[in-house]
UniProtKB/Swiss-Prot annotation:
Pathway as given in its UniProt record: tRNA modification; 5-methoxycarbonylmethyl-2-thiouridine-tRNA biosynthesis
Organism (species): Xenopus tropicalis
Function: Plays a central role in 2-thiolation of mcm(5)S(2)U at tRNA wobble positions of tRNA(Lys), tRNA(Glu) and tRNA(Gln). Directly binds tRNAs and probably acts by catalyzing adenylation of tRNAs, an intermediate required for 2-thiolation. It is unclear whether it acts as a sulfurtransferase that transfers sulfur from thiocarboxylated urm1 onto the uridine of tRNAs at wobble position.
Superkingdom in the source lineage: Eukaryota
Keyword RNA-binding: yes
HAMAP family recorded: CTU1
EC number(s) recorded for this UniProt protein: 2.7.7.-
Protein name: Cytoplasmic tRNA 2-thiolation protein 1
Length: 341
């Protein structure tokens, strides 16, 4: 039996919101979804009028919906923002090259400028080349570190004031679970914070922090947005996948599990008055780092020297050798060359 929209009570409902359980028509769902993101932006004071804001665009559903909604809200509420798309080309054949075509279409559809930076131009390596050397066990570590820095560098080239990423509520809950399981409580503040400033060269924010992944998919579907839906070919063994599967099981039993986990992470995070490692700059590339060498430079050094394990795990004692170009001992080289494919 058809159900009327619980909001307007006039049109026929086409969906039941996973987040609230309300039955809504398309127009009322669009309005509710957009207004919740507007409320998130305003209550957290994410932007200031006149700012140049870079949107991390991958062509996937999250970044596509983020770009669309930010453009809509920027015009509806006169935020006064200068929006620009920033994409990273990791160099993954059959995946990133296809998704970048989607980003280029989004650029035309939303009439926003686009900047693409690549691993090849920044680091001299593509992810295809990296995987051949390091295998599929630790490749996500390399990609995550390089992509984060590449997005910052692309944004710096454009002179943006802030970077927006498409991290949604599910992503944040997954990260909280991963940090719990690894016993890494110190990272809870960063992963649950809607804005992070000290961890990168440019402040980052997550306007979709409280948006459920299912609702993002529904929004993209009913809006007929153009997005790329293929998973990365190198990520099937990623640790995040286990946290994601566990979260889906929890959500099936208790739909509020996603928000419950996020709030738990916020309550358990390290407080502002607790002393954290002092952020300095990498002596090699100048990027923000709490060590003499940033993680990207250590990983890159390992790749260039044929020592793929150099940046995996804790090898801070070797940093002085890297900086002074001292040769490693045979035992150190043997340990750092061994890779589990």
């Amino acid at each position: 039996m058809p159900v009327n929209c619980s909001s307007c009570e006039e049109r026929r409902a086409v969906l039941r919101r996973p987040k609230t359980g309300h039955s809504l028509c398309k127009d009322c769902f669009f309005h509710a979804f957009e207004e919740e993101i507007h409320h998130t932006i305003v209550s957290a004071k994410l932007f200031n009028p006149g700012e140049k804001v870079g949107i991390g665009a991958s062509g996937g559903k999250d970044s596509t919906v983020l770009a669309h909604v930010l453009k809509v809200l920027n015009e509806r509420y006169a935020y006064g923002l200068d929006l620009i798309l920033v994409s990273v080309d990791e160099g993954i054949s059959g995946y990133r090259d296809d998704s970048l075509e989607t980003v280029k279409r989004n650029q035309q559809q939303y009439e926003l400028p686009l900047k693409i930076v690549s691993y090849q131009e920044l680091y001299g390596w593509t992810m295809d080349q990296i995987v051949k050397q390091v295998g599929l066990k630790n490749n996500c570590t390399f990609c995550g570190v390089f992509r984060r820095q590449a997005l910052d560098r692309g944004a710096m080239m454009l002179g943006v004031n802030k970077i927006c990423t498409g991290h949604n509520a599910d992503d944040i809950a997954e990260t909280v679970l991963m940090n719990f399981l690894r016993g890494d409580i110190a990272r809870l503040r960063r992963c649950t914070s809607i804005t992070t400033g000290s961890e990168g060269a440019i402040p980052r924010c997550k306007p979709l922090k409280y948006a459920y992944e299912k609702e993002i998919v529904l929004y993209a579907y009913f809006k007929k947005l153009d997005y790329f839906s293929t998973e990365c070919i190198y990520s099937p063994n990623a640790y995040r996948g286990h946290a994601r599967a566990f979260l889906k099981d929890l959500e099936a039993i208790r739909p509020s599990s996603i928000m419950d986990i996020i709030h738990s992470g916020e309550n358990l995070s390290v407080k502002e008055d607790v002393r954290m490692p002092v952020q300095g700059t990498c002596t090699r590339c100048g990027y923000i780092s709490s060590q003499s060498l940033c993680k990207a430079c250590v990983l890159l050094e390992g790749l260039n020297r044929g020592l793929p394990k150099l940046g995996i795990g804790k090898h801070h004692k070797l940093h002085h050798k890297l900086l002074s170009q001292e040769p490693l001992s045979e035992q150190e080289e043997r340990k750092l060359k061994a890779v589990d494919f």
